[in-house]
């Protein structure tokens, strides 16, 4: 057990969009949102944190941009990390976003465990190219 400083609580994953287990997610989805209970976008931790998130289609890792809204720009968004696939999502495919344990809050607390969000896209109204 890691000794905590008085007043410090561990970093927790709160929610995602799309949610874990979602099906019928639009293949036109441009950005997934990951929400935590602490500031994970501060400059002091951002270089590390943007490397702690990966995304796969099935067993194939896909290229993503991991982005934020700086806490100095909009403090209310300090708990959100955004994941943007560089190429569009395929219809009727399973995706997973993995958040690694070394994700760190501004106060130094780490996530401490791997979090996986899985979702499946639905049909595209226009055929995939």
Tell me what each language-model feature is.
Residues 2-129:
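Acidic, low-complexity Ser/Thr/Gly/Pro-rich repeat segments typical of extracellular/periplasmic
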